[in-house]
Amino acid sequence: MKTYMTVLGAAAAFAPAIAQAGELNLICSADIVICEKIVESFEAGHDTDVNMVRLSSGEAYAKIRAEARNPQTDLWWAGSGDPHLQAANDGLTQPYESPRLAELHDWALAQAKTSDYRTVGVYAGVLGWGYNTEIFDKKGLGAPKCWADLLDPGLKGEIQIADPNSSGTAYTALATLVQLMGEEEAFDYLKKLGSNVSQYTKSGSAPVKSAARGEAGLGIVFMHDAVAQAEQGFPISVVAPCEGTGYEVGSMSIVDGAYNLDAAKEFYDWVLSPEAQNLMPEAGSYQIPSNKAAVASDKALKLEEVKLIDYDFAKYGETETRQHLLDRWSREIGSSG
């Protein structure tokens, strides 16, 4: 029976080893349950042992960058697309044109074309929040429908959002607000929001999990993560902000210098198939799959039902822009937390 490992935390690293035929070193930036489901299913149908580590998008980018001269990773699957685009921009990933590209939605193909085929879209998810209806009722708070509502003084200490340095979800939120409001107004908003934030988490999905457990009133997350908590029976209501919101194109990239390149391409092609993407709802995944023939869960949000901004993936995935926003956030928001 094949085995794989899951390791949590930015310090996790694959043990240096000589790559062997039939091995794949994989970083997974989806929820751990989804990571395990995908790896188990791939191993069941392929003669490949997968060594898997689960890292958030920001952590995955940092790991791949730190190991650029001696890559320990072959393939990075899932996580929001901006860090994947930055990795492509930095030459940390290599081009690959899968024979399945013609099967994908336009938004997934656009991710590939923007990066000169160094990354590709594997799913889409919309930014919003989930709030605990019991906490809101107990405090006499109205349902938060808009970004502006999150500045209500009654929400002091009730909001959680991740740190954009480690979380692709939170970076998407940061870039969304900048595109929606303009940079100066967005940072002014984030400073005011900080008065209501109890914690900047490492993981993008952690805020709504805290809200589900009653440890926070509201988590700013991708809406599919909030749907997952509601489907598990927690008192979570899911909201798409009225002013408009951004979205992610969860992506996949082959690391430049990947030792197990053939295995990486095999996984890459397989995970873009409708068969593989149809496995996602079984793991409680409510993202929108990138293969046009894949069937999304009936609980998944439809992009056409939400007011989306025209998210500029090329600009906000570009190294200079992304680093500027992260540095400013660290100086003005994170340091005051």
PLM features per residue range, with description:
Residues A21-Q86:
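Early extracytoplasmic/lumenal segment of secretory-pathway proteins
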Residues S29-E36, Q72-E215:
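Extracytoplasmic ligand-binding site segments that recognize negatively charged/polar headgroups
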Residues D82-Q86, A212, G217-P235:
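A ligand-binding cleft/hinge motif common to bilobed small-molecule-binding domains
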Residues Q94-E103, T119, A148, L218, ...:
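Short beta-strand->loop
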Residues G125, Y189-G194, Y200-T201, Q232-D256, ...:
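Periplasmic-binding protein-like
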Residues G130-I135, A175, V249-N260, L279-M280:
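A bilobed periplasmic-binding-protein/Venus flytrap-type ligand-binding module shared by bacterial periplasmic
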Residues V255-F313:
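Mature extracytoplasmic/periplasmic domains
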Residues D298-G337:
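Extracellular/periplasmic bilobal clamshell ligand-binding domains
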